[in-house]
Amino acid sequence: MPRYLSLFKYTPEARKGFVKEKAAAREAALKLTIESAGGKLELFNWTVPGSDYSGVTIAEFPDASTYTAVFALVKATGAFSEIKAVELLTASEIDRGLGTWGLVAQADKIVT
């Protein structure tokens, strides 16, 4: 399953609610959301005050469409001023890609 790293930043209003609800409640809510979509929350960490982002997550999803749906749902809450995400690749996925690149590089010699 594809894995995604997300950096998130709360809005000022959401930070106020965060103090009231506590970190564990926010983590539990996200875990439930991801699991209900067939994914798995692997990491949920907060950053120190003064950082550019409020926290970071790593989660696994069945596919990119599922990730996109969860991302849109979370963003629609209005609690985040910014969310940046990247898909993570394993060494074997990179190696497979490099193998494909070799085939593509040869294709330009074939198609003229």
Language-model features and meaning:
Residues M1-S36, K40-E42, T47-Y53, S65-Y67, ...:
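Short S/T/G/P-rich N-terminal loop/turn motif that feeds into the first structured element of a domain
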Residues S6-F8, T57, A85:
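A structural signal for short, well-ordered beta-strand segments
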Residues S54-E60:
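Short cationic amphipathic helices and targeting signals
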Residues E60-E93:
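An amphipathic, aromatic/His-enriched active-site/gating alpha helix that lines ligand/cofactor pockets
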